[in-house]
């Protein structure tokens, strides 16, 4: 059968039947050196992400099927976390089924979904090295707004001790034991940064339960006011909340500082505190997943010896 759009079926996800096929498609895309929407692709990861974002498969996820033989050739997903006004779209098309309009047809369906939810805009990302993906999102009216940057460094690199300005201090969640502080820290420490969401206790409860309280570090100002947060995780992707390796991989998870306290010096001290907290657990590497950090913060990470593994440009389309 010839490969044409008219020979394909577009429908919403049947989770029980389609999920293994979605995983197979995303693995094919990832093996082609392209963004699969997840750092680790598995049935567990895709299913957990869907539950975390409260996706309704009958409205939020589209699949595209060819019939000779039966093959899943396209996947489109609408993610909206809690009450965040900027939903994120992901579109993946099988490498052998491109240039047929599948991606454009999925964009139309996901944009319609966003309009039904009265969203004023939608976001997506594209790896800056993938020119076809960049051209696709620009052609569909998206404009660059920020970036996701994954940085890494060998754990035996050697790190200076953290130096905080006078009066600033760190306390763990185990010491404070109040989920409201966790919520406030996550809502305020990334304020104004792309991809960081304003959540409720209900939104963060599931994620919070996966993090040991002694690995959550709060930054306090001299007057006792909350000033920031970071976390130290082993073998758990900061962005996906799943085990990512059988080797000990450390994540200095998203140092965040409340806007009125922000300075490169505080970000540096907070990062180094998290790194030194990880080192006794003997990780092979230390990773940072930066979502929307300022250029001077990224530059500071690199001055410490971190190198960029991957950078995805974030785009937004106004509806």
Which residues does each predicted region cover?
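Phosphate-binding active sites in nucleotide-utilizing proteins
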Residues: 190-222, 226-235, 255
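Conserved donor-binding loop and adjoining core beta-sheet/short helix segment
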Residues: 11-12, 16, 26-128, 227-253
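Active-site/acyl-donor-binding loops of N-acyltransferases
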Residues: 139-159, 272-319
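Hydrophobic adenine-recognition pocket in adenosine-nucleotide-binding enzymes
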Residues: 93, 255-257, 290
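Conserved acetyl-CoA-binding loop-helix of GNAT-fold acetyltransferases
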Residues: 99-112, 254-257, 263-280, 299-303
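Extended hydrophobic-aromatic, low-complexity segments
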Residues: 193-195, 219, 227-230, 238-248, ...
């Amino acid at each position: 059968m010839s490969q044409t759009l008219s020979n394909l079926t577009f429908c919403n996800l049947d989770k029980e039947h389609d999920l293994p096929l979605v995983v197979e498609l995303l693995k094919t895309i990832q093996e082609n050196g392209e963004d699969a929407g997840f750092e680790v692709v598995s049935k567990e990861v895709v299913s957990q992400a869907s539950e975390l974002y409260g996706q309704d498969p009958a409205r939020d996820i589209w699949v595209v099927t060819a019939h000779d033989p039966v093959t899943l050739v396209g996947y489109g997903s609408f993610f909206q976390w809690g009450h965040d006004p900027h939903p994120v779209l992901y579109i993946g098309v099988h490498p052998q089924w491109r240039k047929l309009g599948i991606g454009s047809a999925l964009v139309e369906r996901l944009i319609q979904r966003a309009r039904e939810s009265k969203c004023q805009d939608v976001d997506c990302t594209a790896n800056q090295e993938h020119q076809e993906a960049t051209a696709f999102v620009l052609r569909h009216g998206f404009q660059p707004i920020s970036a996701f940057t994954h940085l890494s460094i060998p754990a035996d690199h050697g790190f200076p001790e953290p130096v905080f300005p006078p009066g600033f201090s760190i306390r763990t969640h185990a010491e404070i034991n109040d989920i409201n502080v966790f919520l406030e820290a996550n809502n305020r420490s990334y304020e104004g940064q792309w991809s960081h969401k304003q959540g409720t206790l209900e939104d963060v409860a599931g994620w919070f339960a996966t993090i040991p309280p002694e690995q959550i570090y709060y930054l306090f100002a001299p007057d006792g006011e909350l000033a920031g947060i970071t976390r130290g995780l082993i073998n758990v992707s900061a962005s996906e909340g799943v085990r990512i390796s059988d080797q000990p991989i450390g994540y200095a998870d998203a140092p965040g500082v409340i806007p009125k306290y922000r300075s490169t010096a505080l970000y540096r001290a907070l990062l180094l505190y998290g790194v030194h907290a990880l080192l006794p657990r003997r990780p092979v590497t230390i990773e940072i997943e930066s979502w929307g950090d300022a250029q001077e913060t990224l530059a500071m990470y690199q001055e410490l010896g971190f190198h960029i593994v991957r950078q995805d440009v974030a785009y937004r389309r106004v509806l």
